[in-house]
């Protein structure tokens, strides 16, 4: 009789602290941040580092963030660049290399697209 009662109880799944999507995204963010200074960081490198296929990375990042993986990597780099510039410890050129860019004009263009001002203007506004 006890056995029947136990069998009739609903099976409770352990409560997960994070959803699978949150785990996926936090893992991707960690990988991007860990390898941001590498100018070779791209979607293929991210696939290699994470062990996840290109198609799956694209689909999941697009679904969770609304951005393509390329846009997401670039956006993460720009946010990190803004944070580094706010610290006032580094020059624009140093920050550019720290977030994986080697072309100053392209870095400036991407930064301006993200924040509406050049890195130099951003730095001057923060002073």
Question: Where in the sequence are the language-model features?
Answer:
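Terminal helix-turn-helix DNA-binding modules in bacterial transcription factors
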Residues: 63-102, 124-127
């Amino acid at each position: 009789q006890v056995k029947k009662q136990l069998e009739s109880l609903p099976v409770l799944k352990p409560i997960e602290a994070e959803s699978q999507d949150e785990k996926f995204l936090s893992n991707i963010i960690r990988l991007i941040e860990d390898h941001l200074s590498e100018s070779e960081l791209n979607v293929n490198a991210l696939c290699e580092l994470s062990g996840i296929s290109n198609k799956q990375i694209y689909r999941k990042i697009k679904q969770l963030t609304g951005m393509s993986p390329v846009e997401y990597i670039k956006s993460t780099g720009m946010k990190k660049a803004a944070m580094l510039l706010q610290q006032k410890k580094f020059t624009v050129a140093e920050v550019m290399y720290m977030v994986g860019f080697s072309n100053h004009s392209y870095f400036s263009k991407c930064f301006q697209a993200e924040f509406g001002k050049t890195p130099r203007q951003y730095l001057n506004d923060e002073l």
